[in-house]
C-alpha cells in the first residue's frame, strides 16, 4: 500500500475516471500538483491504454485548474520512472509544476537540468 492510498478525497482538487489530483505537500512552486493513478501501479509504463488516454484528460483538467486558481500559463510536466530517475514513491504520479517569470535565473533547458550540468546545449 502506498502513501497515496491514505490521501482523503477531501484533499482531491479534481478527479477523472482513473486519476485524482492533489497539491504537492512539498511544492517546488505555488500550485505544484500531483496527478495520481487510482490504481496502484509502479510507473507510467504500467498504466494500461485507457489510463494513458485518461492521463491526457487529467493533465488538461489540471492545467485548467491551475490557470484559473493561480493565473499561470507555463508548466513543467514530469514523471520519475525508476529509482535512478529519482522516483521515491513507487505509485504512478505525474508532477505538474507551474512556472513563473523569475522563479529561476535562466529557465532555458527546463527538464534537461534533471542531470546537473547537462542541461545547456548552446
List where the protein language model places each region.
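HIT superfamily nucleotide-processing domains
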Residues: 1-122
Amino acid at each position: 500500500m502506498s502513501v497515496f492510498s491514505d490521501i482523503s478525497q477531501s484533499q482531491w482538487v479534481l478527479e477523472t475516471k482513473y486519476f485524482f489530483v492533489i497539491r504537492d505537500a512539498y511544492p517546488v512552486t505555488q500550485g505544484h500538483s500531483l496527478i495520481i493513478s487510482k490504481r496502484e501501479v509502479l510507473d507510467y509504463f504500467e498504466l494500461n491504454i485507457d489510463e494513458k488516454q485518461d492521463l491526457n484528460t487529467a493533465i488538461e483538467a489540471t492545467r485548467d485548474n491551475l490557470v484559473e486558481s493561480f493565473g499561470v500559463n507555463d508548466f513543467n510536466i514530469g514523471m520519475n520512472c525508476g529509482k535512478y530517475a529519482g522516483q521515491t514513491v513507487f505509485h504512478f504520479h505525474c508532477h505538474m509544476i507551474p512556472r513563473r517569470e523569475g522563479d529561476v535565473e535562466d529557465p532555458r533547458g527546463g527538464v534537461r537540468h534533471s542531470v546537473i550540468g547537462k542541461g545547456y546545449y548552446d
